[in-house]
Amino acid sequence: MTKINENVAIQFVKGENEKDQPEIRLFRNLDGKNGKAVYKFYKPTTITLTNYKSVQRMFLIDSEGVLSTKKIDLSISEDHVKEVKSTYSWNSEEAFERFMRFASRYANSLSKN
């Protein structure tokens, strides 16, 4: 499992960095303003059967601050959380650029470890 830089993180539980590396897909409208990033975690480490009901946000944390979304879908089996799908949306060029700075920092933190 890839170690993630502590300065850049994704969290579902405040204070606990998610260690599972997500699959990320970007979608952007032709107008350049609206879009979304869909994150899929296939082996989440911070969401368990005991705490999944309290998970209400995904936090994207970097040196500029915190981005967050409430759009989270969980797939649960009898004995574990199978998959987490979370969608971060934006509706302006500035918000897209801010998201891309986070995404770049997150990707760079993975490649350094």
Curated annotation (Swiss-Prot):
It comes from the Bacteria. Its main location: membrane. It is found in: Cellular thylakoid membrane. InterPro entries: Psb28_c1_sf, PSII_Psb28_class-1. GO terms for cellular component: photosystem II oxygen evolving complex; plasma membrane-derived thylakoid membrane. Keywords: Membrane, Photosynthesis, Photosystem II, Thylakoid. The keyword Lipid metabolism does not apply. GO terms for biological process: photosynthesis. It is a peripheral membrane protein. Belongs to the Psb28 family. Part of the photosystem II complex. This is Photosystem II reaction center Psb28 protein. It comes from Prochlorococcus marinus (strain NATL1A).
